[in-house]
């Protein structure tokens, strides 16, 4: 098994546990801040690629320029992300019925961490992509039969703006060039939480991040934690 959705979830879960156990409500606030920080960076990378390709920052473009796709690991386990669209206009609403992140948080007995994570992730990705998209996560799989996500202002219009161009598939770079593998996503997640913890809590935050790295090594193997260290100096705003 390689870098995948479940390791991505595990990283967030361990930061949640260590931050809240060490710093209480301050730790929870730091976890939310770091989740938003991570997600907004991801959304900005998507937006920069779209702008390079001459695409408008609409919800259609957002969907086309998403950075991840289900891994073979999750497909083989039967828990790859599955969703169904229930409306497209004026509000785009879809329901997620199977999610590997939910599966991992549940396996770890950390549904509370999953609730907090999922409440702040996707809306923050959208905010990084275009803050005028209105993205709401009104329920999640952690406490409901399915996750509900709703998006309005689908054109991403700013106040006073009346129209945007349409997404043009012919202008889009190859799909593979819009994606990043889960090695990258896991590294981005780890270093987002680690950097935010260090900036907020100083030496104690740096020590906490090192302990999460030890958690990863113990649960997944030293090769995973060692690989994450290779990204220590990376600028995750860059595309």
Task: Show where each model-derived region lies.
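N-terminal accessory segment detector
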Residues: 1-91, 100-120, 127, 133-146, ...
């Amino acid at each position: 098994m390689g870098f995948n959705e479940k390791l991505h979830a595990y990283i967030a879960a361990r930061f949640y546990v260590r931050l809240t156990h060490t710093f209480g409500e301050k730790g929870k606030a730091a976890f939310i801040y770091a989740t938003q920080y991570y997600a907004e960076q991801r959304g900005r990378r998507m937006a920069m690629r779209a702008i390079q390709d001459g695409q408008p920052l609409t919800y259609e473009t957002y969907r086309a320029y998403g950075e991840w796709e289900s891994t073979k690991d999750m497909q083989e386990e039967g828990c790859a992300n599955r969703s169904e669209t229930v409306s497209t206009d004026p509000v785009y609403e879809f329901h997620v019925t199977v999610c590997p992140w939910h599966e991992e948080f549940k396996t770890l007995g950390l549904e509370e961490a999953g609730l907090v994570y999922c409440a702040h992730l996707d809306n923050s990705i959208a905010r990084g992509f275009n803050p005028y998209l209105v993205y709401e996560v009104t329920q999640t799989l952690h406490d409901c039969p399915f996750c509900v996500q709703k998006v309005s202002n689908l054109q991403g219009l700013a106040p006073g703006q009346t129209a945007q161009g349409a997404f043009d598939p012919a202008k889009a770079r190859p799909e593979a060039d819009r994606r990043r593998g889960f090695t990258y996503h896991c590294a981005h997640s780890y270093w987002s939480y680690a950097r935010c913890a260090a900036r907020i809590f100083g030496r104690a935050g740096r020590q906490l991040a090192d302990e999460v790295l030890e958690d990863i090594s113990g649960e997944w193997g030293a090769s995973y934690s060692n690989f994450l260290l290779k990204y220590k100096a990376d600028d995750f705003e860059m595309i």
